[in-house]
């Protein structure tokens, strides 16, 4: 019996350091770290940013929400 859109929506988080700098060329594996999570639209209407571990940068970096 839900009315309208769901409050919790799935979001995709992407490493901002990998996107900005490109991934290290001297490393064996290249790519961009992505996480899938969900957020409550009423509590956090703006873009979500979390500190997560990036396996390509080998450190904790800021992962920002990506538009689908």
UniProtKB/Swiss-Prot annotation:
<dbReference type="InterPro" id="IPR001705">
    <property type="entry name" value="Ribosomal_bL33"/>
</dbReference>
<dbReference type="InterPro" id="IPR038584">
    <property type="entry name" value="Ribosomal_bL33_sf"/>
</dbReference>
<dbReference type="GO" id="GO:0009507">
    <property type="term" value="C:chloroplast"/>
</dbReference>
<dbReference type="InterPro" id="IPR018264">
    <property type="entry name" value="Ribosomal_bL33_CS"/>
</dbReference>
<keyword id="KW-0689">Ribosomal protein</keyword>
<protein>
    <recommendedName>
        <fullName>Large ribosomal subunit protein bL33c</fullName>
    </recommendedName>
</protein>
<dbReference type="GO" id="GO:0003735">
    <property type="term" value="F:structural constituent of ribosome"/>
</dbReference>
<dbReference type="InterPro" id="IPR011332">
    <property type="entry name" value="Ribosomal_zn-bd"/>
</dbReference>
<keyword id="KW-0150">Chloroplast</keyword>
<comment type="similarity">
    <text>Belongs to the bacterial ribosomal protein bL33 family.</text>
</comment>
<dbReference type="GO" id="GO:0005840">
    <property type="term" value="C:ribosome"/>
</dbReference>
<dbReference type="Pfam" id="PF00471">
    <property type="entry name" value="Ribosomal_L33"/>
</dbReference>
<dbReference type="GO" id="GO:0006412">
    <property type="term" value="P:translation"/>
</dbReference>
<keyword id="KW-0687">Ribonucleoprotein</keyword>
<dbReference type="GO" id="GO:1990904">
    <property type="term" value="C:ribonucleoprotein complex"/>
</dbReference>
<keyword id="KW-0934">Plastid</keyword>
């Amino acid at each position: 019996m839900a009315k309208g859109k769901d409050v919790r929506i799935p979001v995709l988080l992407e490493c901002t350091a990998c996107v900005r700098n490109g991934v290290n060329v001297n490393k064996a594996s290249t790519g961009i770290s992505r996480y899938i999570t969900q957020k409550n639209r009423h509590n956090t209407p703006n873009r979500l940013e979390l500190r997560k571990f990036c396996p390509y940068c080998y450190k904790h970096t800021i992962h920002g929400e990506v538009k689908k």
